[in-house]
Amino acid sequence: IVPQFADAQNRHFNFDNFAPGLYAFARGLMKKVVIADTFAVAVEAGFASAQTLNTAEAWFVAIGYTLQLYFDFSGYCDMATGVGLMFNIKIPINFNSPYKSLNIREFWQRWHITLSRFLTTYIYFPLGGSRKGMARTCVNLMIVFLLSGLWHGAGWLFLLWGLMHGAASVLYRIFRKPYDGLHPALQWMINFGFIVVAWVFFRATSLTDALAIVKSMLMM
């Protein structure tokens, strides 16, 4: 990004950049104000009543937060991308339809892409990546995702969320062949279901509330 500021050509108005930039900003604003903020009202009420939700309500709240978080975060990113483009600055894409992912690895290639690249480049690769055997690869993955959890917040639930994604990544690494042999629709259901459950721990204010919602989702 920095070299773009030094380019003299980027200091002049360019309608070919301004128009799509304005569209991207408007799209992001709609995602945030119209969609994310609408879900936020129901989600806030749902998590406040975590102990009393039935199965349908628990799933509605969990999926609602899953969508709220995506539209909120990607909305802000779209607005930033749009403003940058209006000033002839191209900002890297940060989200690429992450909930279409069929496995956890693909999810992290589509979700918060800049963070994933940073952690891969500066943590995973220096630790040895996948070059030192399966056991070391699994340890490296766990370290990366635990740090990802801490990056989002210095709380135990963020750490647990990172641990869950690390464990899912390790399991996918170990059982990749049989998993990839499943029907794509089943892969999507498993992956999306896991992501939704993990977001419950990310959003909940206490482990007790998170477990209550998940138990309701599982009809326990």
Range-by-range predicted roles:
Residues 1-220:
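Membrane-embedded transmembrane alpha-helical bundles that form the catalytic cores
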